[in-house]
Amino acid sequence: MNINKFTQKSIEAVNNCEKIAYDYGNQEIDQEHFLYSLMTIEDSLIANLIEKMDINKDTFIKNIETLLSQKTKVSGNVNLYVSNDLNKVLVNAEDEAKRMGDAYVSVEHLMLAMIAAPNKAIKQLFKTYGITRGKFLSVLATVRGNQSVN
């Protein structure tokens, strides 16, 4: 994973995960933290796209918060680490960017990588809301058109 190929919003989303994990008392930074970050960063494209899929953004975020509150909690001064599932998303997002002809990894590539390889909890969440690659790409096309991230 080459962080220099990530857009500012992508870097912001990655960086926010540590605080989210800390706030929830989690040692492992996982896809739930990342999806929450993608949904709650300022001017979130992902939140906009979720709403374009006729999903209530606030309810969706509340469901992610529920997943976060169910994760194993630790106390004290602990070292945070990234889960294998989240690492896979971060690495595969570069492939998503290349597939779309983009030079940089943006938040939509990160979301597509998560849709392609969700962990168990995120897979169930996406299933509940009917979030699929095709549906996501369809709403993305209405926002992005044929622009690329270069």
Regions found by a protein language model. Name each.
Residues M1-N150:
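Histone-fold recognition with a strong bias for associated Lys/Arg-rich disordered tails
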